[in-house]
């Protein structure tokens, strides 16, 4: 991902304020509610029958935290996203058979959740930088599919 020094600074400054536990669960939960077909990958998570059930599900929250932990690793290695996400790409492709389009959807949901949490601080410039990052992460996660 090519970010200007200003974009990198904006991304890392905002990320330092992110509550990974809260935002991770919310982002994954929203993905499962807004794109219900993604729930098929999480059948072992129990009750996902209503938006409230999804958003309150402890397994959704725990996995969302795990997902954002991996995203944090990616932010620390923006110049090597394919290497950083190689094992996760292989896992999601070969073992879990996740449609790589879901990575793009989750990235877009994450941007929406960040905008909601940070309001005016999530300026158009910050959003543009985050869109680049989530697109880069989605491409890295889809790498083994090509």
UniProtKB/Swiss-Prot annotation:
Q: Sum up the protein's function in the record's words.
A: Involved in oxygen transport from the lung to the various peripheral tissues.
Any idea which positions bind heme b? 63, 92
**Keyword terms:** Acetylation, Heme, Iron, Metal-binding, Oxygen transport, Phosphoprotein, S-nitrosylation, Transport
Provide the assembly information. Heterotetramer of two alpha chains and two beta chains.
Name used for this protein in its record: Hemoglobin subunit beta
**Transport keyword on record:** yes
S-nitrosocysteine: which positions carry it? 93
- What organism is recorded for this protein? Hylobates lar
């Amino acid at each position: 991902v090519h970010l200007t020094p200003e974009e990198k600074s904006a991304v890392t400054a905002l990320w330092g304020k992110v509550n990974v536990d809260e935002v991770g669960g919310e982002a994954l939960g929203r993905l499962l509610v807004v794109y219900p077909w993604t729930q098929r990958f999480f059948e072992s998570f129990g009750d996902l029958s209503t938006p409230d059930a999804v958003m309150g599900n402890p397994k959704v929250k725990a996995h969302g935290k795990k997902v954002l932990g991996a995203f944090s690793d990616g932010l620390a290695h923006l110049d090597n996203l394919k290497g950083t996400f190689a094992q996760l790409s292989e896992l999601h492709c070969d073992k879990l058979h996740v449609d790589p389009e879901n990575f793009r959807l989750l990235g877009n949901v994450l941007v929406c959740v960040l905008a909601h949490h940070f309001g005016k601080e999530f300026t158009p410039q910050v959003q543009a930088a985050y869109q680049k990052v989530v697109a880069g992460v989605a491409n890295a996660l889809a790498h083994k599919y090509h």
